[in-house]
């Protein structure tokens, strides 16, 4: 399919779209024709994750270390883990999560290709050579960015605007995060576009899976989906996602949301982050989501975007191998000599020098501990490892200065010769050195005020498990080597929900953190062992391999419907999205239905009212004069039987449609029926006892009082609780609770409780819009005028009964042979209807077209 946008889906309603021959399975160095894909859009094969398939992992940085050669005379030699060019040495970055992810999948399981930037700037004249070396030796595709562009993209938009906002920092003043700068946003978009071009060079869209990582590349899914409508695309956000109240301050909020929704699967570390994302989609885009069989799905233009909630894990094998290194053992011995021999207990903090890590708050809590519990003075040491800051800016420098001054003040107050209560290590440490500190520390403190996953607690737990050699160094008795560990973790980090045995704290409450530190020191040994055992069991079974395999399995499942749907790209720029429809579900063409209308003589037309003829959210619900004129014109043709089918009361509908003499009306979902204005209303079902209202109404009143914006409508035979004007999230939550409550208290009553779009309704059993459709067809059959043309339009779950009756009647005697059947829903969504129109504007336009034809064939 040619990669282009369509602003009018009618152009493609017939399914005629250009196709091209299947691409060769071999991956080309550069795509021969940019933007042209294979005929996978017409390929119905299922998605199977086989050993021959590949994953293209895309991130801001490649898992590669690049070092300039001093002699510059490399011969291009290489090994399994290193490679040399004339000017550079390249090797794997063993600490990179992306490389650990590959190891977790297994060497033989699937081929992995990496796309990303190098940490070092490569001169222009060396880029082609470096590209070839990394592609051939490491299966890495480097993305070379000009320094100025990279600075504006990474240090500008990513670190000054997205990063603070995603960590709940609003730019209320120039000192509190960067104000929105559109030039930085343009740089961000440009870099994402460059990444898309790089992926195009190696992707085989028919088979490859693409997995994008983190907030640096949030608009990349749009560029890939625009090129290949059926690309198998996953995205994982490693940072927090803010609440809707924070996120909606972002000027490009909708662009980012729509870009992410071009993925098939979106992953988050915690339910809180996913919940915030779903809330933003609901409030800003009006999307709905549901949980089905354990999976959360967002309906977006006919596609289901799946939501994955699973925290990342650590690489167990790598950490265990580091624990076994002689260097680690020597370092552990040194630390025991320095602290253990002096009878001092080590508390450990390991954080980046970052404004969100809460280092200063941790130091203040240590100060509070020593003040409130002087018995710990001289006995407890807080070792704070401060990794170099990743970001730049005034706030980072101020935080560093505050950290140093706080450490100095506390050590001067509580220190003594040979004892400093706080040891600050701000020089870079090798990984084995950090692991040695984990092994010796009795408690690990993570007090970030906002963070993504944070794997420090996981590393600490596995390090405390140790091995036999370390047990000997620690002088653990052979018959009593039960391991123990203690964790004090912030409530605001991604790993907190997974660590049920940790002491959780609000890092802003310094007193509470100090109390938690004291509790961790006082916990009995057996309890420390139980907590450690519980944590180690979880961490060891939910490692990075488990995380990667689980994500890819869900990505495969999410892409399973690709081959069975027709896809069209619509929109321009970052508003681009793909409409995915079932093969039998298509947009209702004006030309098609008008042609059928002209060919036929007897017609049945059933129209829902709310959100079908009347736009959703309208304050004045009365039909417009234009709608009245259209209905009167259609009713003027003696071959037409036209019905409005609504949940409204008969009094309301009688008033609204009083100008329509020949219009049929079905009120309260079909309980009441009137063939035309001159005849009396009749009941479609036997008279019912409405004494159940005495039970249901007090329940609804309770929820109305507690849900601002909700109302109750008391009809003759039904009660409706509406939350159209309430907060969408709270209203939906209350509706679910109300539904359960009503079903419980009305279990023995002859009623059904239904939930529709922004309402919960209680009505008599057996009453449905399908009943009206069946009655209408029966009346025409009794008159001997079988309908040759049937049009049924609705937007709600209640209208599905009409669609089912209309579509199934083709096999019965109530419809003429070869009748033209048009069951049409509003919007692209799962439905029993075969057609759709986008909104009420298109519906009114369609009805106006039919009325114009009626004027031609039935003059006044």
From Swiss-Prot:
Region (Glycosyltransferase): 53-557
Alphabetical UniProt keywords: Glycosyltransferase, Phosphoprotein, Transferase
Pfam families: Glyco_transf_20, Trehalose_PPase
Transmembrane segments: none
Uppermost EC category: transferase
Tissues in which the protein is found: Expressed in seedlings, leaves, stems, flowers, siliques and roots.
Single Gene Ontology BP annotation: trehalose biosynthetic process
Keyword Glycosyltransferase recorded: yes
EC number: 2.4.1.15
Disulfide bond entries: none
Residues that bear Phosphoserine: 5
Reactions catalysed: D-glucose 6-phosphate + UDP-alpha-D-glucose = alpha,alpha-trehalose 6-phosphate + UDP + H(+)
Maturation and modification: Phosphorylated.
Annotated GO MF terms: alpha,alpha-trehalose-phosphate synthase (UDP-forming) activity; trehalose-phosphatase activity
Phosphoprotein is among the record's keywords: yes
Consequence when changing residue 152 to S: In cps-1; loss of pavement cell lobes and altered trichomes branching
Assembly, per entry: Binds to the phosphopeptide-binding site of GRF/14-3-3.
Annotated family: In the N-terminal section; belongs to the glycosyltransferase 20 family. In the C-terminal section; belongs to the trehalose phosphatase family.
Protein task: Regulates plant architecture, shape of epidermal pavement cells and branching of trichomes.
Name of the protein in question: Alpha,alpha-trehalose-phosphate synthase [UDP-forming] 6
């Amino acid at each position: 399919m040619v990669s282009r946008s369509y602003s009018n889906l009618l152009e493609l309603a017939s399914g005629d779209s250009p196709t091209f021959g299947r691409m060769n399975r071999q991956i080309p160095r550069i795509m021969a024709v940019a933007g042209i894909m294979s005929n996978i859009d017409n390929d119905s094969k299922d998605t199977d994750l086989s050993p021959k398939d590949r994953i293209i992992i895309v991130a801001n940085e490649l898992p590669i270390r690049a070092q300039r050669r001093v002699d510059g005379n490399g011969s291009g030699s290489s090994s399994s883990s290193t490679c040399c060019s004339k000017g550079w040495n390249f090797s794997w970055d063993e600490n990179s999560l992306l490389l650990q992810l590959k190891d977790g999948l297994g060497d033989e399981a699937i081929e992995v290709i990496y796309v990303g930037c190098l940490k070092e700037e490569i001169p222009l004249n060396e880029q082609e050579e470096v590209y070839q070396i990394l592609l051939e030796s490491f299966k890495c595709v480097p993305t070379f960015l000009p320094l100025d562009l990279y600075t504006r993209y990474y240090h500008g938009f990513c670190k000054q605007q997205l990063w603070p906002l995603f960590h709940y920092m609003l730019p209320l003043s120039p000192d509190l995060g960067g104000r929105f700068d559109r030039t930085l946003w343009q740089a961000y978009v440009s870099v994402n576009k460059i990444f898309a071009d790089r992926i195009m060079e190696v992707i085989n869209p028919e088979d490859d899976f693409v997995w994008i990582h983190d907030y640096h590349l949030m608009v990349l899914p749009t560029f890939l989906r625009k090129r290949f409508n059926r690309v198998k695309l996953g995205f994982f956000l490693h940072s927090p996602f803010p609440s809707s109240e924070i996120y909606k301050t972002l000027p490009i909020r909708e662009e980012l949301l729509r870009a992410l929704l071009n993925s098939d699967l979106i992953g988050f570390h915690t339910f809180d982050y996913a919940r915030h994302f779903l809330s933003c989609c609901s409030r800003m885009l009006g999307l709905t989501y549901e949980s089905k069989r354990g999976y959360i799905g967002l309906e977006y233009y006919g596609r289901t975007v799946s939501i994955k909630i699973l925290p990342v894990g650590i690489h167990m094998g790598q950490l265990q191998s580091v624990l076994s290194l002689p260097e680690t053992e020597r370092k552990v011995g040194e630390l025991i000599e320095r602290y253990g021999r002096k009878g001092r207990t080590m508390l450990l903090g390991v954080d980046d020098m970052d404004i969100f890590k809460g280092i200063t708050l941790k130091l203040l809590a240590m100060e509070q501990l020593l003040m409130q519990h002087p018995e710990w003075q001289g006995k407890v040491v807080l070792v704070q490892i401060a990794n170099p800051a990743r970001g730049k800016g005034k706030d980072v420098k101020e935080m560093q200065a505050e950290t140093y001054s706080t450490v100095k003040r506390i050590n001067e107050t509580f220190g003594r010769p040979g004892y400093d209560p706080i040891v600050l290590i701000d020089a870079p440490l090798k990984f084995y050195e950090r692991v040695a500190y984990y092994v010796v520390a009795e408690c690990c403190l993570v007090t970030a005020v906002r963070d993504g996953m944070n794997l420090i607690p996981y590393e600490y737990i596995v390090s405390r498990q140790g091995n036999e050699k370390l047990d000997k160094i620690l002088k653990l008795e052979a018959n009593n080597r039960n391991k123990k560990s203690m964790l004090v973790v912030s409530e605001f980090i991604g790993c907190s929900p997974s660590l049920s045995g940790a002491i959780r704290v609000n890092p802003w409450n310094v007193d509470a953190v100090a109390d938690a530190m004291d509790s961790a020191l006082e916990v009995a040994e057996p309890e420390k062992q139980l907590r450690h055992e519980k944590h180690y069991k979880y961490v060891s079974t939910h490692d990075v391999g488990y995380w990667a395999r689980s994500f890819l399995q869900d990505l495969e499942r999410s892409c399973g419907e690709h081959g069975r749907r027709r896809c069209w790209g619509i929109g321009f720029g970052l508003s681009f999205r793909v409409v995915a429809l079932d093969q039998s579900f298509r947009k209702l063409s004006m030309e098609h239905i008008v042609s059928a209308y002209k060919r036929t003589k007897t017609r049945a037309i059933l129209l829902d009212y709310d959100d079908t003829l009347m736009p959703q959210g309208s304050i004045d619900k009365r039909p417009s004069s234009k709608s009245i004129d259209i209905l009167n014109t259609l009713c003027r043709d003696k071959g037409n039987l036209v019905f409005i089918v609504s949940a409204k009361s008969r009094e309301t509908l009688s008033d609204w449609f009083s100008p329509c003499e020949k219009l049929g009306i079905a009120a309260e979902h079909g309980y009441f029926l009137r063939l035309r204005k001159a005849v009396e209303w009749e009941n479609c079902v036997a008279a019912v006892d409405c004494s159940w209202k005495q039970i249901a109404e007090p329940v609804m009143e309770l929820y109305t009082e507690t849900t601002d914006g909700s109302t109750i409508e008391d009809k003759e035979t039904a009660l409706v609780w509406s939350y159209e004007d309430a907060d969408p999230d709270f209203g939906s939550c209350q509706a679910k609770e109300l539904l359960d409550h009503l079903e419980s208290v009305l279990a023995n009553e002859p009623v059904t409780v239904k939930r529709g779009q922004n309402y919960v309704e209680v009505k008599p059993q057996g009453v449905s819009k399908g009943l009206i459709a069946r009655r209408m067809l029966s009346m025409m059959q009794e008159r001997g005028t079988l309908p040759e043309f049937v049009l049924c339009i609705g937007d709600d779950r209640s209208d599905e009964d009409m669609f089912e009756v209309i579509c199934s009647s083709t096999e019965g005697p109530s419809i003429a042979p070869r009748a033209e059947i048009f069951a049409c829903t509003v919007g692209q969504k799962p439905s029993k209807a075969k057609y759709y129109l986008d909104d009420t504007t298109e519906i009114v336009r369609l009805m106006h077209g039919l009325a114009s034809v009626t004027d031609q064939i039935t003059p006044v």
